[in-house]
């Protein structure tokens, strides 16, 4: 302990300030999103919650959290997985392949999923309780039949942009807050691509849920941290 800290503690004791926390021990102030911040709600769809075709455990629990913190944001973007029938990411498109196995596509290794979020189906609709009336944009992704898309910013081939980066930059957005499903896939890819595009990025952990396939959640957090993505809780955001 430094001399200055000893003096401060001694002074507090002399004033009867027992139990008062020293300034450097106090919690950081809450984050207040401004006009240059955006909330992205990733793939909060029927297919990814209980009863869907590719359910994420406790996926519906993100809905009230996202609804609550959304009131702190002027700018909101929603993404929607929007696959064609027989999509290249579906295990059913290959003889002898099962969901969660992998295959090689032109852009690299692809996890094969159960058929999910097929365009125009109820399964692909946004969760009925997701309430984001001030959302300004819906990004539909994964609609190219031969290319999967986890990120809101870039297709899985790492060369086909969705246009979201340009849209946000035109509006002066500097900071991105990512929520939704699933933490270790679409949320993580969105967060890392946002960092690559030059944005400050926060992932709101309790506003996300993960698939956690063969350690994918721990790997995702590690990869996000390495890219400079910050991990926070919804309580860290000033609402109201």
Please state what every model-predicted region is.
Residues 64-175:
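Active-site alpha/beta core segments
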Residues 131-132, 215-240:
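Structural recognition of alpha->loop->beta junctions
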Residues 49-58:
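Acidic/histidine-rich helix-loop elements
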């Amino acid at each position: 302990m430094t001399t200055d800290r000893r003096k401060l503690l001694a002074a507090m004791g002399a004033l009867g300030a027992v139990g008062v926390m020293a300034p450097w021990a106090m919690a950081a102030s809450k984050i207040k999103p401004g006009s240059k911040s955006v909330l992205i709600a990733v793939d909060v769809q029927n297919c990814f919650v209980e009863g869907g075709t590719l359910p994420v455990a406790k996926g519906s629990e993100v809905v009230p959290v996202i609804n609550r913190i959304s009131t702190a944001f002027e700018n909101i973007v929603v993404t929607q997985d929007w696959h064609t029938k027989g999509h290249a990411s579906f295990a059913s498109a290959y003889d002898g392949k099962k969901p969660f196995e992998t295959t090689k596509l032109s852009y690299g290794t692809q996890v094969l999923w159960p058929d999910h979020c097929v365009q125009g189906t109820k399964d692909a609709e946004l969760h009925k309780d997701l309430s984001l009336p001030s959302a300004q944009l819906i990004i539909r992704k994964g609609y190219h039949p031969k290319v999967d898309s986890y990120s809101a910013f870039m297709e899985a081939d790492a060369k086909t942009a969705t246009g979201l980066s340009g849209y946000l930059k035109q509006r002066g957005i500097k900071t991105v807050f990512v929520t939704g499903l699933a933490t270790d896939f679409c949320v993580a890819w969105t967060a890392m691509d946002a960092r690559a595009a030059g944005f400050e990025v926060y992932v709101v952990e309790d506003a996300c849920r993960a698939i956690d396939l063969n350690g994918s959640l721990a790997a995702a957090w590690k990869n996000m941290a390495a890219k400079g993505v910050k991990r926070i809780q919804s309580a860290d955001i000033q609402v109201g």
